Swiss-Prot record:
Similarity comment: family membership: Belongs to the bacterial ribosomal protein bL33 family.
Gene name of the encoded protein: rpmG
Entry keywords, A to Z: Ribonucleoprotein, Ribosomal protein
Pfam families: Ribosomal_L33
Protein name (record): Large ribosomal subunit protein bL33
GO biological process per UniProt: translation
Record-linked PANTHER family: 54S RIBOSOMAL PROTEIN L39, MITOCHONDRIAL (PTHR15238), LARGE RIBOSOMAL SUBUNIT PROTEIN BL33M (PTHR15238:SF1)
Source organism of the structure: Caulobacter vibrioides (strain NA1000 / CB15N)
């Protein structure tokens, strides 16, 4: 069987609240670490979320 093109990643909040999003990305075309600005409901602000591994 072929290896899937998309992998699941965890986007961790840089505000150190412990909040995270789980999303998918194409590992073949997006080789760098993903950084997105999203909403953190714990502090009720938009902050950067950085890619981390799912345990």
């Amino acid at each position: 069987m072929a290896k899937p093109a998309s992998i699941k990643i965890r986007l961790n909040s840089t505000a150190d609240t412990g909040f995270f999003y789980v999303t998918k990305k194409n590992a073949r075309t997006k080789t760098e670490k993903m950084v997105l600005k999203k909403y953190d409901p714990v502090i009720r602000k938009h902050v950067e979320f950085r890619e981390g591994k799912i345990k």
